[in-house]
Amino acid sequence: MNRAEWSLSEPGIDLIILGLGANDMLRGIQPDETERNLEEIIKIANSKKIKIIIAGMVAPTTHGTKYKKNFDAIYPKLSKKYNLPLIPFLLEGVALDPNLNQHDGIHPNKAGTIVISNTIQDIISKNY
């Protein structure tokens, strides 16, 4: 969180794509802590008049169904609370597709990043 204030103080930032959670989720950080961190970033960006798009993530069931339910609810909740555009799942259409991921099966390859970039561009075009 210390980096958020510093990073968002750079001149010329008009818009951020706010996506946080995959690594927090994989490390088992509780959804309420992830939500607080995201909300703090939203407040900092809003105070600087920076536009925001929320890039959602979904949790697998490896941490249990309660964790998944709570984690998956974070992004729509913040989008609604702050009236921000939402990409429900940033990796939609990319996750689990071997043609769109690196050999590790987790990280998008060049083709996968193009799909993600197009999704982001569509949201930007529709909202800003």
Describe every region a protein language model picked out.
Residues 1-128:
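Alpha-helical cap/lid subdomain in secreted, periplasmic
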